[in-house]
């Protein structure tokens, strides 16, 4: 799903520098002998970090936008689910965007914030039934891909609870009897892996490609910003699940229900994958109850397919407003101070409908010996300790030794 255009690659090393998977980038030479960095799809986790930093447009991605639009025009019955990050991607006109999609044939569009509320409820109930169990959050599919490929010893800790997207889709199918195909609108490239594997959602349409689609169909976003839209999500609206896109969103939701949980967060490719690699080396007693992790440094609002990147100040302002609004919606308890939304979930939902099992990916590991690394360093002209420890990062790797290992 991450695509590569060799004609545009200048081997600037930016993709290597940000990639959490050293083996996902392969050094090759084109027919003219020019060095290029291709992609090994078996080792790629689809985090999209390389897409965000490639200023030459050599890296891009595929989603399901064209297939979705073609099916819609053929009359295929489709309903939509939309990630709450839509308010960040289409700031000031998200209702108009979804109204356009609905007018063009999508019968209903549901709010994934509601699925995020189900996700929070399922985590709380799961932890109550499994006291002492340590969980790694899984709403981020790039994180799931990384654990399944490179941190398989941590797989037993990966939360069995479905992501908010899948919780929403399961609810539509099992509880509302929805039979139409489901399109998910998201800022995430890697969601496509999750959808293909589970078979619950039929199309991953990224916000970036959705915006391009609207422009091709004559939508003027400046005009859309000034036009009042009456669009409303179908079905039950979400509450605190609307804060999931921000870093620590799951943590905030879980702590509202159980403030005694030990939850720590990590996000961004610079740190989260290092922390995941350390996770299984830590004594069980030192692990948090929940490790809330996201691949993107500012959460889903900075996803690789969000479209135009928003300033951290504007993003924070929007998310704070969303949180304040939804906190006022949520403060509705019964006489025993129990959350009414969760009481309703307890009556209607079965937690087993919202869980999944994971299998490790069959990734062939390449074992490099110290002797091979030493030999490669010598071939690279690095014969002294000083030369072997320049570690200037210009090649994209953190150390000279890491580069020699990759080569």
Model-derived features with residue positions:
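Iron-sulfur cluster-binding cysteine motifs and their immediate structural context
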Residues: 4, 10-40, 45-65, 304-309, ...
């Amino acid at each position: 799903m991450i695509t590569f255009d060799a004609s545009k690659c200048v081997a600037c090393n930016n993709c290597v520098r940000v990639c959490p998977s050293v083996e996902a980038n392969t050094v090759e030479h084109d027919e003219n002998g020019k060095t290029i960095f291709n992609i090994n799809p078996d080792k790629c986790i689809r985090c999209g970090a390389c897409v965000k930093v490639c200023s030459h447009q050599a890296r891009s991605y595929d989603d399901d936008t064209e297939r979705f639009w073609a099916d819609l025009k053929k009359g295929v019955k489709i309903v939509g689910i939309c990630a709450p990050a839509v308010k960040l991607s289409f700031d000031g006109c998200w209702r108009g965007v979804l109204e356009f999609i609905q007018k063009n044939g999508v019968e209903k569009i549901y709010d994934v914030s509601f699925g995020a509320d189900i996700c929070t409820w399922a985590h709380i109930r799961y932890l109550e039934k499994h006291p002492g169990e340590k969980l790694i959050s899984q709403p981020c599919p790039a994180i799931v891909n990384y654990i399944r490929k490179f941190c398989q010893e941590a797989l037993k800790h990966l939360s069995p609870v479905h992501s908010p997207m899948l919780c929403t889709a399961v609810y539509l199918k099992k509880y509302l009897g929805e039979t139409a195909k489901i399109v998910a609108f998201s800022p995430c490239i890697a969601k496509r892996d999750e959808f293909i594997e589970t078979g619950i959602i039929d199309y991953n349409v990224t916000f970036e490609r959705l915006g391009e689609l609207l422009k091709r169909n004559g939508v003027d976003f400046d005009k859309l910003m000034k036009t009042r839209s009456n669009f409303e999500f179908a079905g039950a609206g979400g509450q605190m699940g609307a804060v999931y896109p921000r870093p620590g969103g799951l943590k905030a939701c879980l702590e509202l229900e159980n403030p005694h949980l030990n939850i720590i967060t990590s996000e961004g490719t610079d740190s989260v994958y290092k922390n995941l690699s350390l996770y299984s080396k830590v004594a069980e007693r030192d692990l948090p109850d929940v490790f809330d992790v996201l691949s993107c440094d500012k959460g889903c609002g900075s996803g690789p397919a969000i479209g135009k990147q928003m300033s951290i100040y504007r993003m924070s302002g929007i998310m704070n407003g969303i949180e304040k609004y939804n906190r006022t919606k949520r403060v509705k308890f019964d006489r025993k101070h129990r959350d009414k939304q969760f009481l309703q979930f307890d009556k209607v939902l079965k937690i087993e409908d919202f869980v999944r099992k994971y299998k490790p990916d069959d990734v062939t590991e390449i074992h490099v010996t110290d002797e091979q690394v030493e030999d490669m360093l010598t071939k690279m002209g690095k014969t002294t300790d000083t030369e072997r420890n320049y570690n200037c990062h210009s090649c994209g790797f953190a150390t000279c030794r890491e580069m020699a290992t990759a080569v």
